[in-house]
């Protein structure tokens, strides 16, 4: 049974992107998680002992993390704790615990983030996840007046909320005017 944990902390260095002999991308990083406790006697917050946890990511996920994360960033990581036994050059046996990361990203407590869809050559990932597989047309080709509707609602013009509710994603030759507000599923 794997022990799944969530760790929140700061990256101690930029993620280290390397490639195995077979060409698989791998990233190693260290997350420093320092608990903070309130000392009632002094009336101050104090740092506890930091935990330095080594994390590892593989393949496309490793490439995306290396391109997105940097030293000092506060991140939240979810993964499985793995114990690794090894022998040093001197012949000493050692054990280390690593976090095999399933999910990682910046926390938004003290920062903002903008995300963009990663495209990997040869992996069939479309730059537009909503694109029609046959025509290649994206979502913008299927919406009608969405910017105008949004602007009118902000200015109190038009039908307001009801008009905004009609901003639905529909196929070719169908527009939001074809729906009554009672038919809109939201």
Curated annotation (Swiss-Prot):
Q: Write down the InterPro entries for this protein, in alphabetical order.
A: NA-bd_OB-fold, Primosome_PriB/ssb, ssDNA-bd
Record flagged with keyword DNA-binding: yes
Q: Per its record, what are the GO molecular function terms?
A: single-stranded DNA binding
The record's section on CDD domains has: SSB_OBF
Region (Disordered) residue ranges read 120-186
Q: Which residues form the SSB domain?
A: 1-108
Biological process (GO) annotations held by this record are: DNA replication
Q: Where is the composition biased (Polar residues)?
A: 132-141
Q: Which UniProt keywords apply?
A: DNA-binding
Biased composition regions of type Acidic residues, renumbered to the chain: 175-186
Question: NCBIfam families attached here?
Answer: PRK07772.1, ssb
Record protein name field: Single-stranded DNA-binding protein 1
**Taxonomic source organism:** Tropheryma whipplei (strain TW08/27)
């Amino acid at each position: 049974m794997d022990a799944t944990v969530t760790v929140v902390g700061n990256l101690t260095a930029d993620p280290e992107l390397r490639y195995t002999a077979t060409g698989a991308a791998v990233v190693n990083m260290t997350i420093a998680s320092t608990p903070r406790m309130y000392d009632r006697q002094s009336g101050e917050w104090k740092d506890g002992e930091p935990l330095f946890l080594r994390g590892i990511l593989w393949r496309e996920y490793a490439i995306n993390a290396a391109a997105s994360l940097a030293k000092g960033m506060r991140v939240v990581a979810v993964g499985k704790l793995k114990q690794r036994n090894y022998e040093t050059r001197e012949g000493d046996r050692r054990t280390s615990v690593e976090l095999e990361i399933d999910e990682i990203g910046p926390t938004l407590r003290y920062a903002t983030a903008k995300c963009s869809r990663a495209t990997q050559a040869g992996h069939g990932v479309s730059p537009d996840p909503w694109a029609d597989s046959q025509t290649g047309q994206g979502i913008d080709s299927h919406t009608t007046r969405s910017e105008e509707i949004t602007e009118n609602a902000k200015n109190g013009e038009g039908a307001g909320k009801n008009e905004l509710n009609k901003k639905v994603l529909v196929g070719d030759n169908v527009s939001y005017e074809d729906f009554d507000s009672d038919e809109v599923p939201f």
